[in-house]
Every structure is written in structure tokens, then in C-alpha cells.
Amino acid sequence: MSLTEEIKKRRTFAIISHPDAGKTTITEQLLYFGGEIREAGTVKGKKSGTFAKSDWMDIEKQRGISVTSSVMQFDYAGKRVNILDTPGHEDFSEDTYRTLMAVDAAVMVVDSAKGIEAQTKKLFEVVKHRNIPVFTFINKLDRDGREPLELLEELEEVLGIASYPMNWPIGMGRAFEGLYDLHNKRLELYKGDERFASIEDGDQLFANNPFYEQVKEDIELLQEAGNVFSEQAILDGDLTPVFFGSALTNFGVQTFLDTFLEFAPEPHGHKTTEGNVVDPLAKDFSGFVFKIQANMDPKHRDRIAFVRIVSGEFERGMGVNLTRTGKGAKLSNVTQFMAESRENVTNAVAGDIIGVYDTGTYQVGDTLTVGKNKFEFEPLPTFTPEIFMKVSPKNVMKQKSFHKGIEQLVQEGAIQLYKNYQTGEYMLGAVGQLQFEVFKHRMEGEYNAEVVMTPMGKKTVRWISEDDLDQRMSSSRNILAKDRFDQPVFLFENDFALRWFADKYPDVTLEEKM
């Protein structure tokens, strides 16, 4: 098969949702259809000892939540599918946002009882900003939920995107009978031995069933007043196809997968800092690091840099340029993943995600190129932390482990590090409290370094240029610090302290990140 044909087979997408909407369960079912797991186990198997395939970190297994993005790959129906399962927990939005830079489409999982929740809305805004296609799976039809028309209306109003139902539920909860499949023009049956039936048989199958009569009325209304189906509108991110189903009972999931692969886009190009778009079908290899993860295998204390291949083909042992440093690197020890299990890979193409063993060479956002090509892709988003803690080693004899742990976890982007300009004291910044808990857990479990953490509360963060810097500007209400790149930064006690500073030093430019 030619390189172009290989690249056109790729489908790379992320699954996004609010916590507990069923995101990891649907991931399990997709892997089951891809033949990667023998049984799709329910995710929160804390008592049974069975854990989700994509929740590999110790703390994830204890809590039944995803706190890191997992990368999984399988072949299905002539396509090579790359799934990135992202953390649903709001504190880990940084990791999720960066992951969304590495995909060509997103699958949004919605709980039918709860509709569009806060985290879903937040993540959708990032996806919308990138204009990538969004496919919606409304989950948990095996339980009682809200009316389908109400859910579609909320989706359109809250997210500001047009929707088109690909199927429609016949009842829900205990009265759930199946799906009226508008796209494939058939009925998908929840009960009995037969999985499908023709629409012509519907009146006989569901004689005297008020839910089926309601479905026919709903569909008539949608056909008269609903949106027109358009493949181009889907690819432009203007229309989301909506699928109903139940991930837990594996109902409607395979139909979703088949239809998703029919309409999901091939790998797309990425913009460089100069505004050019790198074509995925170009023969020269290029890619960018969107995530770094330490200790995926605690026995080996390893670090993996996750690279999205943007163009061309990776071959084992190839030399690449690391644009940020201007130095070369050799990609000899490279893996692909099924959550924590992995296999060495000898070649991969645009659209694929590979893991490069890293001894500290790479940073999140790095661009890799070959030959004379030395461009950089657009930077990944960075986020301004909102809450802070001072951190120090509990045991002074463990300084080495403490520094190694902090360095690796900061390079992962799991937490942000600041040093007090005057005292050199370490301060950690996070988007939410759970990030601190995970940091402490990993420092103790993976680096054998107990830490003392002292809350500093919320701070308003602003960056300042070296030229404007005067250490006398610092006070107890605005702490002067350096970020991990040695850029000066002020941590203001509150918005009032920020305004007071701005009034006192009107010529000083204060910069805010996302």
C-alpha cells in the first residue's frame, strides 16, 4: 500500500465528556469491537479488581476517574483508528486541551439524564475554536433520561451548533425498546434475538406501543423543521451528528462506530508559526509533542513523549531536528499504545500517535522535522493557574528524589512550578485542587519523596518582561517569582492588588495567559 493510501486510512479522535457521562465505558466498547480487549468491562470495577483498560495510573484505578489522557490504537473496517481518551475531571482540562490539538475529530459523550454539563461545554469551546468535527453520543438510554427533543434543543442552544439525529430512541429506561435508525433506514432492537428489523416491520413489532407512536411523530417533526444533513457541514464543525445508545449494555455503539468512520475526516494539516499549513501527504516526516508522561511503567521509571505525526512517515532509527534547540535527535526507541501496554513500532504515518522514550530532551509543544525543514508548529495552549501551594521535601535527605520528581511532573505539564524571586522557595500552581492531590500521590508513590504542601490560596497571575522588572515592585500582596522558563511573573493576592499595581506602575505591561 502506498504512503498516501496508508495516511488516508487513519482516523484520529478524542473522546470528551463531563465526569461520569460514560466516556471510558464507550472507549472500552470501541476497543472491544476493534478486537483489542476480549471483554469490555464496566469501568468502576474498584471492588471486583477489574479496571478500565484506559485507566492505567494507580490513582485512577483507586478512584475510578481518568486523570491523564490515554492513547489507544486498533484496526477496524479497513481503517486504522487512534483514540485519545481524555480526563473528564475538570482539574485536568490542561491535559485535555493539549490532547485536542493532536486530533482530527472529537466524540462528545452526553448523559441522557443530565444533558450538557459544565465540563462538556468548556471542552466543546476548545473543539469549536479549532473547527474540528464533533460527533455526539447521547448515552445511558438503559436508564430514564430527558426527552430526546429537549436534549437536542439544549445541545443547540448551549453549544451553538446545529444537530442532526442519526437515530432516535424508542422509549428509555425500563421501557427502552431500541433505536429508529434514520441514517441506515432500519430498526435496531434492544430485546429479543434479532438485532435489526426493517422499518416496514415496525408497526407490527411495536403494535399498541405508545413510545413507537411518539417516535414516528418526533421523526415527522424533525423532517419538517429539523436541520438538513450535510457532510460538509459536519467536516466544517458546523453540524454535529447525534447518536443515541447505551455504552454500558453495548447497544448502539457499533452502529455509531460504523457511521463515525464513514464520515470522520482523514488526517489534516497543521499550521506553522509562519502561517503555512503542512500537508499530511507530504513525504517528509514532521510532528509535535503534545504530552509527556513519566512513569507509565513504574518498574522502569521511564518518560514518554507523545508525538502526533503531522506529515510523512516515521521509520525506526530516523534522525530528526528538534527545532526549539536546533539540535538533532534519533528516534530509535519508539512505541505505540494500548493504555499502559505497549509495543515497539518500526514505522507509523501522518495521523498516528507515537511514544518516544525521553531522557529529558523533549518539552510539550516541541516540533520535530527532518532534513532542511526547520519550521515550528503553532504553540499549544498554556494555562494560568488559579490556586497555589508552597512545596518542600519532608526529608532533607531526599532532596535528589524531590527535585527529580518535580522536574519530571512539571515537564509533563501535570502542574506548574514557580520559584520565589527572593527566597528561591518552590511554589506550585494548578487549575484545580485534584492536581495537587495527584502530584503528592505521585511524588510519594513514584519518586519515594514525601512532600510538605502549604496552601497559599488563590492568586491572580501576570507575566512581566525583564526590561520592566524592578525587584522593589514586590510586596506581600504581589509575590515576584520565576516560572519554569525563568520568566518573571507576579502572583497577586487578588484583583484589587492587581489593579492597585497597575495604577502605581502604568508603564509596566502585565501579560495574561489562557
Swiss-Prot record:
Keyword Cytoplasm: yes
Annotated tr-type G domain residues: 8-268
Single Gene Ontology MF annotation: GTPase activity
GO annotation, biological process: regulation of translational termination
Places the protein is found: Cytoplasm
Keywords for this protein: Cytoplasm, GTP-binding, Nucleotide-binding, Protein biosynthesis
Binding annotation for GTP: 17-24, 85-89, 139-142
PROSITE patterns in the record: G_TR_1, G_TR_2
Native organism: Streptococcus pyogenes serotype M28 (strain MGAS6180)
Protein name according to UniProt: Peptide chain release factor 3
Role this protein plays: Increases the formation of ribosomal termination complexes and stimulates activities of RF-1 and RF-2. It binds guanine nucleotides and has strong preference for UGA stop codons. It may interact directly with the ribosome. The stimulation of RF-1 and RF-2 is significantly reduced by GTP and GDP, but not by GMP.
Top-level taxon of the source organism: Bacteria
